[in-house]
Curated annotation (Swiss-Prot):
Residues 1-61 are annotated as: Disordered. The lineage of its organism: Bacteria, Bacillati, Bacillota, Bacilli, Lactobacillales. Belongs to the universal ribosomal protein uL15 family. The gene is rplO. This is Large ribosomal subunit protein uL15. Part of the 50S ribosomal subunit. Binds to the 23S rRNA. It comes from the Bacteria.
Length: 146
């Protein structure tokens, strides 16, 4: 037996079903689309949420709430993420972005108190949670609101 004589095992390679190739193929004429109607046509079909002309559920439900255009969205950083820095480092939003901890600054950076801080750092951010503030100062570090 040579390399060019190798064949796939019987039944291991299934032949793709080609529709619309004659009635004797089993999938000719209507190509598995049933009889006439919107769904049988080329490009036919109904949009997402369409209920046959009946007022759809999303329009029957009342509107609720609103989006406040003045909402400030902060980039959130937890304490355990700050352990990548050396002792005595001044951590600013720019430094956090360079380190890959923060992608976009948004309305500024907020430091949260999840995890444990093991380094003494000077942290500058727009906001601090009370637990984060306490943890940073407990390690001998300092905080500055910018």
């Amino acid at each position: 037996m040579k390399l060019h004589e190798l064949k796939a095992a019987e039944g291991s390679r299934k032949v793709r079903n080609r529709v619309g190739r004659g009635t004797s193929s089993g999938n000719g004429k209507t190509s598995g689309r049933g009889q006439k109607g919107q769904k049988s046509r080329s490009g036919g079909g109904v949009r997402l949420g369409f209920e046959g002309g009946q007022t759809p559920l999303f329009r029957r439900m009342p509107k609720r709430g609103f989006s406040n255009i003045n909402t400030k969205e902060y980039a959130l950083v937890n304490l355990d993420q700050l352990n990548v820095f050396e002792d005595g480092t001044e951590v600013t939003p720019v430094v956090l972005k360079e380190a890959g901890i923060v992608r976009a600054e948004k309305s500024g950076v907020k430091i949260l108190g999840n995890g444990e801080l093991t380094k003494k750092l000077t942290v500058k951010a727009a906001k601090f949670s009370k637990s984060a503030e306490a943890a940073i100062t407990a390690k001998g570090g300092s905080i500055e609101v910018i």
